[in-house]
Regions:
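Amphipathic alpha-helical repeat scaffolds of TPR domains
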Residues: 13, 45-72, 86-147, 151-210
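Amphipathic alpha-helical segments of tetratricopeptide repeats
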Residues: 31-38, 92-93, 100, 165, ...
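Short amphipathic alpha-helical heptad-repeat segments
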Residues: 19-26, 52-58, 194-201, 218-225
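Inward-facing hydrophobic residues that define packing positions of alpha-helical scaffold repeats
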Residues: 30, 81, 88, 95, ...
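Extended alpha-helical scaffolding segments
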Residues: 203-247
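Eukaryotic intrinsically disordered, low-complexity segments enriched for acidic and Ser/Thr/Pro residues
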Residues: 1-41, 265-268
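Alpha-helical linker/edge segments of TPR/alpha-solenoid repeat scaffolds
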Residues: 117-123, 143, 250-269
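Alpha-helical positions within canonical tetratricopeptide repeat
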Residues: 76, 83, 155, 221, ...
Length: 269
């Protein structure tokens, strides 16, 4: 790699100064919101939605500073990428606190939590989840294909998928799929995204099990994400699709059971 010129380094440091000030301002706003929540928990769900948005904005500046490092200095800034990655988790955690982290449980398991943000409409939900997805993708792209965090992102993306799914109102989802219903296009896009992400999470957890960890908990999570996908199929009255997913779950469960038996036999020998 060619030596970075002093002019390029100076330009980089000057450019990111404004971004660092903005980062400080966002962090101070978050502290103020958290202080308010400590004194009064009223409307805490909406405040956490605000905190998720603030941290997505914060994350974007770390991504931007890394991109500037690449373009001006010719090198990735792992420190900024790591901060962005941590913020991805922070945003997901805020959202899990709002709509729960229930993967394959029934709507009744988290219905009460989602009801608390009823005025957070379908348009705002769509904007937030697409912004979250873009943020995760930008961080992944920043690290590159050969990152040591490859398998860690399987969990992050799966937790994001759960949040996307849990922001759907499964009680009204079938009616929402009527082309004449208000917000049909956005709600359909939301459902399509949730289904794609859940299937992707199932496949990636199985891949993680087979190619990396050999941890049975990863295989169990793969099956749970298929279960979540099945719940969505049932919610929109797609019985045949739900049955096909159930068959796939049974096949995967049988493989898991067989692997567990083989492991048990091997340990006893």
């Amino acid at each position: 790699m060619s030596k970075v010129s002093e002019d390029a380094r100076k330009k980089y440091l000057e450019t990111i100064q404004d971004y660092k000030k903005t980062i400080e301002d966002i962090e101070n706003r978050e502290k103020l919101i958290l202080q308010v929540m400590e004194k009064d928990a009223t409307g805490s769900e909406y405040k956490k939605l605000r905190l998720a948005e603030e941290n997505l904005n914060l994350l974007s500046y770390y991504v931007l500073m890394n991109n500037l490092s690449v373009s001006l200095l010719g090198v990735k800034n792992e420190g900024y990428l790591n901060e962005a990655r941590k913020l991805c988790y922070k945003v997901v955690i805020y959202m899990e606190q709002v709509v729960s982290n229930v993967i394959d449980g029934p709507w009744s398991d988290y219905e009460d939590k989602v009801a608390l943000i009823s005025s957070f409409d379908y348009q705002d939900r769509w904007k937030l989840i697409t912004k979250m997805g873009l943020a995760i993708q930008l961080v992944l792209t920043g690290y590159g294909d050969n990152t040591k965090w490859k398998w860690a992102f399987v969990e992050l993306e799966a937790r994001y998928a759960t949040v996307v799914k849990n922001l759907l109102n499964l009680k009204t989802l079938f009616q929402d799929m009527d082309p004449n219903a208000e917000g049909y296009d956005i709600k359909t896009a939301h459902l399509t995204l949730a289904r794609r992400l859940l299937e992707q999470s199932a496949n990636k957890y199985r891949e993680k099990f087979e190619l990396s960890t050999l941890r049975f908990d990863d295989f169990r999570l793969a099956i749970k994400y298929l279960g979540a996908l099945r719940y969505l199929a049932l919610a929109v009255n797609k019985a045949t699709e739900a049955e096909n997913i159930k068959k796939k779950m049974d096949i995967w469960q049988q493989k898991l059971d067989n692997d567990l038996k083989r492991k048990d036999i091997a340990e006893k020998q």
